[in-house]
Amino acid sequence: MHGVTTESQGAKAPLAGAGELRVLLTADQIASRVRALGLEIARDYDGERPLLVAVLKGACMFQADLARASALDLELDFLSVSSYGSDTTAQGPPRLISDVRADVAGRHVLLCEGVVDSGRTVSYILDALGSRRPASLVVATLLNKLPCRKIEVPLRYVGFSIGADFVVGYGLDRAERYRNLPFIGIPEEM
């Protein structure tokens, strides 16, 4: 049976239909860094009620943990943008699948992204949300893939800078798999 390498014991853990993963960032490393980012955000938005917008589906776990770590009075919202098919490479320009429900005008908006690679999706979202006149609009990303950058985008809060490897776990997927893993891993078969 195929499995994934668990980060804490180095043993194989069964995961139906999955190959092996090489752990890049452990659950403890992620939790520690997200807590630090949450404290920084709490300090930066003290006295404000920011709107945390997750880019679905990849940023859902990051947004939830970041919101808890900040301990702020805040609002959560979501949007979905896609440029991917079932493959791991972009298939075209980003397109909005579902929009935020909140009115962002005059609000402090913090866009939560799981990974920023080419920068195209984040640039597209920043343009779309920026046209609605928020009081401020900044990006928090768990992972920053600088080697893949095609468009420069401003990133205010960065969890980790990583290489160009395709990664999964902690909300990030490969063909809708691996999102539920508590760590970030690199699929061995890729």
Predicted regions and their residues:
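PRPP-associated nucleotide enzymes
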Residues: M1-M190
